[in-house]
């Protein structure tokens, strides 16, 4: 999926507005994913998955940091996310559907925290961006 110049602007502008909260939102979205889609917990048997878990928050920050990298490299997502793609495809073997589930929970989390900024255009742009990131992360499964 190709991001238009307007999509890129929407994503960058929205991500910039998150400020220091990206890691917090990443943790919240990950917790939301585990709650709404319990099968996603199978990849984290060594984690404390309870509400407010430090491990979930730390992993959520990693997710947010990876997305921050992706936002900074929207014109070269495959290059920017190559190592992460290798990790998820070859070592962790995460079912690709889980990226879609987490993307949905990220959209919900961002909409809850920034309802005024979460216009239909921004929603569509973020959805396309998360889809593009998911496609890159699953590209090495083939």
Swiss-Prot record:
Sites where the protein binds heme b: 88
Binding sites annotated in the UniProt record for O2: 59
Source organism of this protein record: Arctocephalus galapagoensis (Galapagoes fur seal)
SUPFAM superfamilies, A to Z: Globin-like
Keyword set includes Iron: yes
GO terms for cellular component: blood microparticle; haptoglobin-hemoglobin complex; hemoglobin complex
Expressing tissues: Red blood cells.
Keywords, comma-separated and alphabetical: Heme, Iron, Metal-binding, Oxygen transport, Transport
Function of the molecule: Involved in oxygen transport from the lung to the various peripheral tissues.
Lineage per the UniProt record: Eukaryota, Metazoa, Chordata, Craniata, Vertebrata
Listed name of the protein: Hemoglobin subunit alpha-2
């Amino acid at each position: 999926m190709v991001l238009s110049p307007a999509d890129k602007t929407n994503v960058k502008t929205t991500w910039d507005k998150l400020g220091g909260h990206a890691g917090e939102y990443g943790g919240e979205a990950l917790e939301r994913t585990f709650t709404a889609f319990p099968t996603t917990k199978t990849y984290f048997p060594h984690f404390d998955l309870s509400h407010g878990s430090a491990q979930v928050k730390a992993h959520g920050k990693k997710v947010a940091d990876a997305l921050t990298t992706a936002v900074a490299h929207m014109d070269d997502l495959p290059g920017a996310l190559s190592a992460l793609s290798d990790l998820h495809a070859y070592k962790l073997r995460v079912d690709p559907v889980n990226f879609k589930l987490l993307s949905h929970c990220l959209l919900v989390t961002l909409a809850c925290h920034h309802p005024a900024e979460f216009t239909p255009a921004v929603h569509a742009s973020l959805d396309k961006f998360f889809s593009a990131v998911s496609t890159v992360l699953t590209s090495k499964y083939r």
